[in-house]
Amino acid sequence: MNIQALLSEKVRQAMIAAGAPADCEPQVRQSAKVQFGNYQANGMMAVAKKLGMAPRQLAEQVLTHLDLNGIASKVEIAGPGFINIFLDPAFLAEHVQQALASDRLGVAMPEKQTIVVDYSAPNVAKEMHVGHLRSTIIGDAAVRTLEFLGHKVIRANHVGDWGTQFGMLIAWLEKQQQENAGEMELADLEGFYRDAKKHYDEDEEFAERARNYVVKLQSGDEYFREMWRKLVDITMTQNQITYDRLNVTLTRDDVMGESLYNPMLPGIVADLKAKGLAVESEGATVVFLDEFKNKEGEPMGVIIQKKDGGYLYTTTDIACAKYRYETLHADRVLYYIDSRQHQHLMQAWAIVRKAGYVPESVPLEHHMFGMMLGKDGKPFKTRAGGTVKLADLLDEALERARRLVAEKNPDMPADELEKLANAVGIGAVKYADLSKNRTTDYIFDWDNMLAFEGNTAPYMQYAYTRVLSVFRKAEIDEEQLAAAPVIIREDREAQLAARLLQFEETLTVVAREGTPHVMCAYLYDLAGLFSGFYEHCPILSAENEEVRNSRLKLAQLTAKTLKLGLDTLGIETVERM
């Protein structure tokens, strides 16, 4: 049930009847304060100006055409021409019943689309570090939300599995007589990488051999391809352990590395030349873009093939977008890549559009994100100033959560404590990130993220268990409760019911904008409203069974909504804490 969409259409029709153009925007929003009702239509200002009317006068005319019978108990004009809408308690009660009767809590499915989501994208032969966290978990929350809404989602893990470094690695593995790379661990591989790089920089003979190996690898020599595949396998096997720990839905089947697009690159360069988009410049092949200017104010040149014949990331990204449209049949493509790559992507996509590889009707969206910072406001590092490995971060989260949970539950059996610590620790790291607007940098702070108060995973997980405990105490028969009516008489009942029915609106925003923090804010607000409702509207000691059962149903929908909302974020819930 999307009440905002329902009201928007009703107000829009009333505005048209009052003389507004057919494309008018009613601008129906959730009200910020309870005294302004549940929703507010703010579109009179802009439309009245076009019609040469006072906004309040237009609002008065709109009200004469606005039929919200059975939806709103009161509609009033406020200020210069805002229309405040107060939902009818009977309408709220009816839709709470409907939500409880549905596995999807009454959430409708929009028209199904094929949506490609590009996220995580670690590099082969390197361990995942904290820089991969945001893309991985924000992208996964978007994927979960889109799948819940019924879309066909194709996860694309664009791993860095190609480049000159592989010649260097294979040469070094050979030198160490460790061709059986399959028995190596990724941590070993990182050490090998460092040693190989050192030799590459210091030993010209070794560097020459590495360069020859790259040529052989790129020409398809089976021995070198096999060595390369082993390196990829080691990396992705280790990364899968991290994905599973993070409760992220990525699997090996979702890997679509840079190498996938290699066969397309010569054809793309030739095609861009044939279309007159790419030209020779100082030996390289370049596309000049009017939309981007260099320091001299001239069109910026984007190199797609170097003079030695090598291709660039831009060439791969052009091929990648083309593949996602032509082969995967994407209706929409989302890229969860950090904000520093924005200009690079915009340039690649400008070429994609000019070449006609992806039509304008298929959005290519850069859902960029900021950096994870330490308490000092600088990029998050180890004490020694090195990059923090993601596995080490998760180990520390688990250890801190274990201490926290043991302190609060000294008698809990060890296996139960471990399960709870895992849910709290991993949940805390993920939620701390997801609850921040992805476009901004954020401060990583263990104390804040593991707190049991505020907008944190432990607080949300505890709020869920608190609602469940009401049911345990009630010892209620589920079938008997299902048949009971919902009655809304108290203000706090109405406020909780109205917020519960805004779940679909919240999902819609997350799906459209790729902003999981909106879901976090909604769930946190919902938990707070339930707390106030529980305090002021007795459930188990209600004045009669009818009121008790009705309030239990509000509690039941709260628990279901919290669980489902946290699930779309990839945050695990527990029955007891």
Swiss-Prot record:
InterPro entries tied to this protein: aa-tRNA-synth_I_CS, Arg-tRNA-ligase, Arg-tRNA-synth_N, Arg-tRNA-synth_N_sf, ArgRS_core, DALR_anticod-bd, Rossmann-like_a/b/a_fold, tRNAsynth_Ia_anticodon-bd
Motif extent ('HIGH' region): 122-132
Catalysed reactions, semicolon-separated: tRNA(Arg) + L-arginine + ATP = L-arginyl-tRNA(Arg) + AMP + diphosphate
Main location class: cytoplasm
GO BP of this protein: arginyl-tRNA aminoacylation
EC numbers for this chain: 6.1.1.19
Annotated TM spans: none
Gene3D superfamilies, per the entry: Arginyl tRNA synthetase N-terminal domain (3.30.1360.70), HUPs (3.40.50.620), Isoleucyl-tRNA Synthetase, Domain 1 (1.10.730.10)
A GO term for molecular function: arginine-tRNA ligase activity
GO cellular component assignments: cytoplasm
The protein's enzyme class: ligase
Protein localization: Cytoplasm
Coiled-coil spans in chain: none
Annotated family: Belongs to the class-I aminoacyl-tRNA synthetase family.
NCBIfam families, A to Z: argS
Quaternary assembly: Monomer.
Protein name: Arginine--tRNA ligase
Organism (species): Escherichia coli O1:K1 / APEC
